[in-house]
Amino acid sequence: MAFNKDQDYWANIFVTPDFLSVETYSGLGMTGRDPLFSPRLLQPDVDDKSLGEEILQALSDSRTLDVLEERVAFFDLEKSKEQYAAWIATLMEKYGYRTKRALFKNMKKVGIHLVNDVITIRPSFHEKLEAWSGNRINESDYVVLPADSSPTEIGSGLRLALSRCKG
């Protein structure tokens, strides 16, 4: 896939023992889940090549929202709350979680950023039920790959980053 120089591409991965969700994020500076692209829900044991292909597609779908009106609409608080609630409801129904606590308890999150032919995969610290941060994560925990890495290498890199998640 071709990625533009000096353009940021974003994705986030959410993982539980029951699923792996590859999600496109868009924005400008601040990013958010892009409602134009449905989460790619995979089995946690998906092969690295397929996983890498889904990550590359999610990154390719990422949009830079450089028009102010577009950003204002994209980050509308009420719409964002509705979309987040729908995301939770979908995951709970599809995977049989009875409570949000059960859904989020063992969930890991990894952020992926691609810019200027470099993919940076950042593990996170699970702060509280629905919150992750970079606290307790060192830059040495990041997985950094060239953008022309094979899908298998990217999938493997994600698994390495997941193993470095904390909390």
From Swiss-Prot:
Superkingdom assignment: Bacteria
Residues passing through the membrane, by range: none
Pfam families according to UniProt: CdiI
Known partners and oligomeric status: Interacts with the C-terminal fragment (CT, residues 88-377) of cognate toxin protein CdiA-o11-EC869. Probably recognizes only the toxic DNase subdomain of CdiA-o11-EC869 (approximately residues 222-377).
Role noted for this protein: Immunity protein component of a toxin-immunity protein module, which functions as a cellular contact-dependent growth inhibition (CDI) system. CDI modules allow bacteria to communicate with and inhibit the growth of closely related neighboring bacteria in a contact-dependent fashion. Neutralizes the toxic activity of cognate toxin CdiA-o11-EC869 (the C-terminal 289 residue CT fragment). Does not inhibit toxic activity of CdiA from other toxin-immunity modules or strains of E.coli.
Designated name of the protein: Immunity protein CdiI-o11
Native organism: Escherichia coli O157:H7 (strain EC869)
Organism placement in taxonomy: Bacteria, Pseudomonadati, Pseudomonadota, Gammaproteobacteria, Enterobacterales
